Every structure is written in structure tokens, then in C-alpha cells.
A protein has these predicted regions:
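Hydrophobic faces of well-ordered beta-strands that scaffold small-molecule active sites
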Residues: 47-49, 118-120, 164-166, 253, ...
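Aromatic/acidic polysaccharide-binding cleft in carbohydrate-active enzymes
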Residues: 54, 296-297, 303, 309-310, ...
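Active-site-proximal helices and loops of the catalytic beta/alpha 8
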Residues: 151-163, 171-172, 177-188, 241-243, ...
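Carbohydrate-binding surface patches
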Residues: 468-499
Length: 499
């Protein structure tokens, strides 16, 4: 009898050199994408900066328009955590008054830092400070300013070589919204109020009015019916949300919880934004390898050229944090990055949003020394700071992570204040105010110089990538051009990007 041997994907299923098997092996992934797919150059060549608008800079002392909002008079005090009785989540009703004009005033700082793309967390009218509970998609939250302020911000930013991306929250709204209107705070007949509401079909009611589908079971965030034609027209029509704010000056959308949006919704949205602007981008919040993600039983074709231009590169971020924390050997870092490189179309891989920090996790400085205080109740995490030794170690590792991100394909993304040394546990304490006048100047200088180097070396945005490791603690990144004229990389003993 003959004996069959098979050759297939490596046993960790990360591609590269395969393995022999006696039984049918795991297959390699083959990604077939639209050959015309080509995200705009400003993604590939960009350096991004994420801003949580309430916490970056305020141009004036705010005035509360609602009685349920708490305004901080002291800019530098920590955010509050007050639990919602229904969900246990933070109420998020304390505000510091950061605004769009405040961001505009700091454009010179951002330009000097090397930033070319601003990603703003939600700016539309909402109840909370994070504004992921949209109240009115067509109106800027009054605490942030108005449409004229947004237009002025985009115009001035573009004059300084900076584009603006908005956060699109199209999976759910707030219960306190023009569309749901649970509390009657808006001048509309909301879906909660009546089955005769023009917005009733936008939601999934099991039994009207109190039994309805909500995002992850959080009752303050009623889930939208993305299949509803009137809702789709509202978002994607000629005068819809997506195109309206592109007309006002935005260059694209970061899509919150992209996995919650049906694939045909994303395809239609892509067509809509391209009707408005051919270089408008869609960037998705996806936490895993976006080339083979399955959500709600459906394969997500994020990377094939018909939906997204880019995603948030959480897999890379997680791998680098573990590596710098001595929890993952360099060999595994190389395996993980090569797997993404192998699975993603080249235009997609070079346009990834390589985030450092995030509004959804503890501050990067904390994570790099495992000081996220997750073992403590939320109320006890407020205002905690690391001791001098841990802070120095965190800063050292942070600078190394900036160096690594800087040398890899994709656009680095700095979460506001990380370059200034900000600390903080998870939400809401990772959303503190920018420490103007109290920044870590040496870290700021390091980041500024790193980004200057990236912008001055085209090989770092367009060059080929080779990875190697020497032992468990040394990762070597080599970037080179096809003709060999522009090479980035040095011997191990003095390489600035060798860790």
C-alpha cells in the first residue's frame, strides 16, 4: 500500500514555510483582491493623530446646556467614573469643554509634531462625553462648536497639510436621540414614542416600546436596522450623513464597530463616499486579522478592495506590547507580522492604521509596564500614577514602540497625549485631558524627531520589508527599495530600530 504525505500551512497557521502532514493539512490563505484597489497616498504616507475632542484643548470655558452634564472647572483633574445602574458602564456625563476651536488653535503644534491626518472621536450631538451615543448626525455637539467651526478646522488643517477623518457610528444611536427619543428631549416623534414614527423601522423592537435590540445589550444604545432602506438613504444618500460631512471638509470616515455593519452596507457606503470624493477613505475598527475575519457567521471581505481602505492594526499593536513587555519572543513577533504581510493585499498592508494608544484601552505607558490597575474597582483607579522607576521604564518602552511602528509599513497613529507622557487606566481614565504646560518634553522631542525621519525617508512608506531576529529579544527591521538605492537598516550593534 502507498503512503500519502501532505504539505500544507505551518502548524500555527500563520503561513510562511509549511509543514508535512499524514492527513490533509490546513490550507494556506490565498487573498484575491481587485487589482484596481489603491488607497489614497495620504494613508500610506500619513502620520495620524487621534483626538478625543472633549479632552484635547478648550478655547473657552464651556456653558452647560443640559442639567445632567457636569462641567469640570479644573482642566487637569482626572475624569469621574459614575456607574450607570442599568448597564454598569460609566455614565460619561462629565465634560472638560475641549472643542473644535481648541483643536484648530493647536494645529501648529500638530504640524510641528509631523501629523498629516487627524482622526476625531465622534463630534455629533449626543448625551455623553464620548458621543458614541449619537443624538443628531446632522449637528455638531454644541459643547464642541458648530458646523462653521468644523469647516474652519478642516480648511485650516488642509492648509497645513493635515486631513481630518471623522468617527462614523452607524451601528446604533443613543436612546436620547432625534431618532429614538426615549425622553422627549428632541423635537421629533421618536421610534420609542410611537410606532407611527418615521424612524420606527430603523430599530428592532421585540415588543414596543421597552423591549428592543441594543448594542451588546446596553439599553442606552439601541441597535439600528442596517437593512432598512430609509436608514440607508439617510446615511448614504446624496444629502446623507456620509456625503454631507465630506462636503464640509472631512476626508473620510473611521467606522466604529465595522463588524456590526453588513457587507452590502459597507459596499454601498464606499460607493457613496466615492461619489462625493474619489480619495475619501473608509477605515474600519477591526480587532483581528481583517483578511479572514468571520463575524455573525459571515466572512468579512474587508481587504478585497470593495469595502474598506484600511483597518486599525490591533494585532500589530498587541504583539509589540507583549514583545516590549518581555512576554513574547522576537521570533513570534516576526511570525505574526509576516502573517499579516502575507494575508493582506500590498496596498492594504501599506495603508494600515498602526495605532499606538487607544481610547478603548488603558494608556500605552501603563500597558507597557502592566500597570493598568485592572484588579482595582473603577472608582479606585482615578488619578493613580506610576512611581518614578516604572514611569522611566514605561517611557523607555514607549519610545522603542514608536521606533518600531515608525519603521514598519502603514501609518503610525499617536493617541493624543501619549507623546506627552500621559498615564491612565482603562476608560474613562485613559481619556484624561492633555497636560498643556506639563508635558514630558524629552518624549515629545523623541516623537517629533522619529516622525521627521519617517517623512524624510520614502523607503519607510514605500519600501520593501524584511524582518529578522537574533535571539528572543532582538528584532531587526530592514526596509529597502527595488533598485537598492534607498536602504534603511544598520548593523545590530548600532541600529536605531533594533531592539
Amino acid at each position: 500500500r502507498g503512503h500519502w504525505m501532505y504539505y500544507g500551512n505551518a502548524r500555527d497557521k500563520l503561513g510562511g514555510i509549511g509543514a508535512h502532514y499524514q492527513d490533509p493539512p490546513p490550507a494556506y490563505q490565498i487573498t484575491v483582491y481587485d487589482p484596481a484597489f489603491n488607497p489614497p497616498d495620504f494613508l500610506r504616507e500619513g502620520i495620524m493623530y487621534q483626538i478625543f475632542p472633549d479632552r484635547f484643548h478648550r478655547s473657552k470655558m464651556p456653558v452647560a446646556e443640559r442639567r445632567d452634564r457636569v462641567l469640570h472647572s479644573e482642566w487637569n483633574e482626572p475624569p469621574y467614573f459614575i456607574a450607570d445602574d442599568r448597564s454598569g458602564d460609566n455614565w460619561a456625563l462629565d465634560f472638560f469643554g475641549g472643542d473644535l476651536e481648541g483643536i484648530r488653535q493647536k494645529l501648529p503644534y500638530l504640524k510641528d509634531l509631523g501629523i498629516t491626518i487627524l482622526y476625531l472621536n465622534p463630534i455629533f450631538q449626543a448625551r455623553t462625553n464620548h458621543r458614541y451615543d449619537t443624538g443628531d448626525y446632522m449637528k455638531i455637539d454644541p459643547l464642541l462648536g458648530n458646523e462653521e467651526d468644523f469647516i474652519r478646522l478642516c480648511e485650516d488643517a488642509r492648509q497645513q497639510g493635515i486631513r481630518v477623518l471623522l468617527d462614523g457610528v452607524f451601528s446604533h444611536t443613543g436612546e436620547d436621540s432625534l431618532y429614538f427619543n426615549r425622553y422627549g428631549n428632541y423635537p421629533s416623534l421618536g421610534a420609542y414614542q410611537s410606532k407611527e414614527s418615521p424612524f420606527y423601522s430603523w430599530y428592532h423592537f421585540r415588543k414596543h416600546p421597552d423591549n428592543y435590540a441594543s448594542w451588546w445589550g446596553i439599553p442606552t444604545l439601541p441597535e439600528l436596522n442596517k437593512a432598512d432602506s430609509s436608514y440607508r438613504h439617510f446615511i448614504m444618500g446624496p444629502a446623507g450623513v456620509a456625503r454631507r460631512w465630506l462636503k464640509a471638509g472631512a476626508s473620510g470616515w473611521r467606522l466604529d464597530v465595522a463588524d456590526e455593519l453588513p457587507m452590502d452596507f459597507l459596499r454601498e457606503l464606499r460607493k457613496a463616499v466615492h461619489r462625493e470624493s474619489k480619495d475619501a477613505v473608509l477605515l474600519g475598527e477591526v480587532w483581528e486579522d481583517a483578511s479572514n475575519k468571520i463575524a455573525y457567521g459571515q466572512m468579512r471581505s474587508y481587504v478585497l478592495g470593495d469595502t474598506l481602505d484600511s483597518v486599525m492594526n490591533y494585532p500589530l499593536r498587541d504583539v509589540l506590547i507583549r514583545f516590549l513587555s518581555h512576554e513574547l519572543p522576537a521570533q513570534q513577533v516576526v511570525r505574526q507580522i509576516r502573517s499579516l504581510q502575507e494575508n493582506y493585499p500590498l496596498p492594504f498592508f501599506y495603508s494600515l492604521m498602526n495605532l499606538l494608544g487607544s481610547h478603548d484601552r488603558a494608556r500605552l505607558h501603563n500597558l507597557l509596564v502592566r500597570q493598568d490597575y485592572a484588579h482595582l474597582p473603577n472608582a479606585q483607579r482615578r488619578g493613580l500614577e506610576m512611581d518614578k522607576h516604572l514611569k522611566e521604564l514605561a517611557t523607555e518602552r514607549f519610545c522603542k514602540m514608536v521606533s518600531l511602528i515608525n519603521a514598519l509599513p502603514g501609518m503610525p497613529c499617536m493617541y493624543y497625549g501619549d507623546e506627552a507622557g500621559m498615564e491612565g487606566a482603562a476608560d474613562p481614565f485613559c481619556r484624561g485631558t492633555f497636560p498643556w504646560g506639563k508635558e514630558d518634553r524629552s518624549t515629545q522631542d523623541f516623537v517629533r524627531e522619529a516622525f521627521r525621519l519617517r517623512k524624510s525617508r520614502p523607503v519607510l512608506t514605500r519600501g520593501f520589508l524584511e524582518l529578522a531576529c537574533e535571539g528572543e529579544d532582538t528584532l531587526v527591521i530592514h526596509r529597502y527599495s527595488k533598485d537598492g538605492k534607498d536602504v534603511f537598516g544598520q548593523p545590530l550593534d548600532d541600529a536605531p530600530y533594533t531592539l
